[in-house]
């Protein structure tokens, strides 16, 4: 019997689809941001307990990207299986900072490293200045139970 692998809470895996490649069947760099979004939403869903979006009293919180940076350090081709690890840098405010590491599953070669920064807004485009207590507690609990998802960004900034 084969033991099944349990993925860390900050990891997703997927294969490069043909539609995501150029004529040489190498993935197009623009797909990296779509994959980062998938990793970010998967991490948020696990962090706040099964919800893909954060809500405050039934009102959704939006987190538009305000800054992004990517270093393309390798490449992947059609059919390659990739691993995306998403990390978060805890903040004193409601600003969200995510870091990403995209690697090939077969050999662990790094394909891309990146970061995105986000502000948090509520209905009407108003800034959210403080996490609701319930959301803040879920985040603290998640960070203490999953220290591997937390970063200070140093391992990423050096290569960006």
What residue ranges belong to the model's regions?
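Terminal targeting signals and extreme-terminal segments of soluble enzymes
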Residues: 1-81, 89-160
């Amino acid at each position: 019997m084969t033991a099944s692998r349990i993925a860390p809470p900050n990891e997703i895996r997927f294969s490069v689809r043909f539609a995501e490649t150029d004529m040489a069947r190498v993935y197009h760099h623009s797909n990296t941001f779509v994959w980062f979004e998938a990793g970010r939403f998967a991490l948020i869903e696990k962090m706040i307990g099964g919800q893909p979006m954060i809500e405050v009293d039934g009102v959704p919180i939006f987190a538009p990207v305000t800054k992004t940076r990517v270093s393309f350090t390798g490449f992947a081709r059609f059919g390659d299986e990739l691993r995306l690890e998403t990390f978060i840098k805890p903040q004193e405010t409601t600003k969200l900072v995510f870091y990403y590491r995209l690697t090939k599953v077969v050999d662990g070669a790094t394909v891309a490293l990146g970061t995105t920064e986000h502000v948090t807004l509520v209905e009407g485009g108003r800034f959210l200045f403080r996490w609701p207590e319930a959301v803040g507690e879920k985040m603290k609990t998640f960070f203490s139970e999953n220290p591997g998802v937390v970063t200070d960004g140093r391992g990423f900034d050096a290569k960006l």
